[in-house]
């Protein structure tokens, strides 16, 4: 991993010069960033992320942050003596777990992110999908990946019905940085826990984002031998689903990324959140990180 503080001044100047055409290219464009993994738990990486987001805003790019919080939810459940359960990468969410999820995501995790961005000189505003009627949802009907006739009950896990981006756009226009917790609401005002990767992908589509970037704890999508796959097409992804290469928590991430690519998001990247300042390196330099998802 590269520590930016150890880069020589001349090299830093070259990086800044390299960034100029990308700043011109992406000025006024929206970038949706799924923030999760080690980048959320390592203090140095947290600071790097906040600085990257603020700098993007300062140069005229509009970052929108959608955050996860799996480790924090697991820690809260453990403190309360409740065991987490997952089916095909989705957290089973009963009523009690839903209350914990809302408290952890909409409170603890979100406010930490907002505070870090504001401390770095930005103007972050925390939202959940309830705010401004942003994310309408319904109970997710989860079918088995290999047997479509088999259905799982995952409780208050939501499937997105619609996203109204008007509150996000209003914040962007006023120089704010939206930080969104992946919680939706149903027709009876019930809350739904929605996978953050799915929310980020759908929001990127609705906002007509230039890029969708998903930060992970690994270098990108790996084959069964552990080698990085730098580019993936829809057909290749189908093959990786079928042979089990993509499984667990990667399932909703890759499915969401592919849906966004098919729906017009210009580029979709799954990148290594363990790399310091990976957002700036991915967006504003010639360097490429992780896996790029293509619709064809």
Curated annotation (Swiss-Prot):
Broad class of where this protein is predominantly found: cytoplasm
GO MF assignments: acetylglutamate kinase activity; ATP binding
EC number, UniProt record: 2.7.2.8
Site (Transition state stabilizer): 34, 253
Keywords tagged on the record: Amino-acid biosynthesis, Arginine biosynthesis, ATP-binding, Cytoplasm, Kinase, Nucleotide-binding, Transferase
Known catalytic reactions: N-acetyl-L-glutamate + ATP = N-acetyl-L-glutamyl 5-phosphate + ADP
One GO BP: L-arginine biosynthetic process
Pathway field: Amino-acid biosynthesis; L-arginine biosynthesis; N(2)-acetyl-L-ornithine from L-glutamate: step 2/4
A cellular component term, taken from the record's GO annotations: cytoplasm
Subcellular localization, as worded in the UniProt entry: Cytoplasm
One matching Pfam family: AA_kinase
UniProt binding sites for substrate: 69-70, 91, 193
InterPro entries (UniProt xref): AceGlu_kinase-like_sf, AcgluKinase_fam, ArgB, Asp/Glu/Uridylate_kinase, Glu/AcGlu_kinase, NAGK-C
Stored HAMAP family: ArgB
Role of this protein: Catalyzes the ATP-dependent phosphorylation of N-acetyl-L-glutamate.
UniProt-listed NCBIfam families: argB
Name of this protein: Acetylglutamate kinase
